Amino acid sequence: MVKCFDFFLSLNFGKMTKLLVWRTDKPQDDMPQTPNSQVTIVSRDHPRGGNY
């Protein structure tokens, strides 16, 4: 449960930060990092819950 919540918070924070700073600074450099960890977490929690 904590991992899911942390993941959700990270996603929300990442979106906000991207819109505020990284979007204008360097979106290409930030983009690969966020989806990378996102894919890893989703892949790990996929068997437990396909919804996430």
Swiss-Prot record:
Residues 31-41 have a biased composition (Polar residues). Residues 25-52 are annotated as: Disordered. Induction: Up-regulated by the GmPep914 peptide, ethephon, methyl jasmonate and methyl salicylate. Keywords: Plant defense. Changing D45A: No effect on alkalinization activity. Changing N51A: Loss of alkalinization activity. This is Protein PROPEP914. The gene is PROPEP914.
